[in-house]
Regions:
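Residue-level marker of positions within ordered structural domains that often coincide
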Residues: 2, 43, 127
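Short His/Asp/Glu-rich catalytic/ion-coordination signatures at enzyme active sites or charged loops
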Residues: 1-8, 132-138
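Charged substrate- and nucleic-acid-binding regions of tRNA-handling and nucleotidyl-transfer enzymes
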Residues: 98-163
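Small-residue-rich helix-loop
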Residues: 5-111
């Protein structure tokens, strides 16, 4: 693990590329941005494909991922957060890290909740995983606007199905 952390970003990126290619087929994904997120979070290069596969395809996941004691999230408040995040993000003209961050942090203020109560559900909807390299802002930036909104919509539908 130490060896990987000592590499420059370019060196790491070069070594990581063949592993990305195993699970990321979408040419519009900026692999260099993934390298920046991943380098400090990878012990061995062969772990890479399973850490990044969700960028290409959202895995099947259960709504229990939205329930997190420490983050103070449950199915109800996650649904509300996703609905509001969808509304706000869909209005964004410039899809940049800063714009996404400002939008979601303003939403946190507006809803008067903890950061995690908006960011955990969004990150979960975008990755479909318990843990991911990077949080809501990074993932949204890399996935792009259409895919981000699409995945949030899927999260909303999953959560709505459990409320009946």
């Amino acid at each position: 693990g130490e060896y990987i952390k000592k590499l420059s970003l370019d060196e790491f990126h070069e070594k990581a590329l063949p592993y990305y290619k195993q699970s990321i087929k979408n040419p519009s994904i900026d692999l260099k941005k993934i390298s920046a997120l991943l380098q400090s979070r990878v012990e061995i290069l062969s772990d890479i494909p399973e850490k990044v596969d969700f960028f290409d395809n959202l895995p099947e996941y259960g709504v229990e991922l939205y329930v997190h004691k420490k983050m103070k999230t449950n199915e109800e408040n996650s649904l509300l957060a996703l609905e509001k995040a969808y509304e706000k993000l869909s209005l964004l003209e410039n899809w940049t890290f800063n714009e996404i961050e400002n939008t979601l942090m303003n939403l946190v203020k507006e809803m008067e909740v903890k950061n995690s109560q908006v960011l955990w559900p969004v990150r979960t909807a975008l990755s479909g995983k318990q843990s991911s390299p990077g949080g809501a802002f990074e993932l949204a930036e890399i996935l792009g606007k259409d895919e981000t909104l699409n995945r949030i919509k899927i999260g909303i539908a999953k959560l709505k199905n459990t409320q009946n």
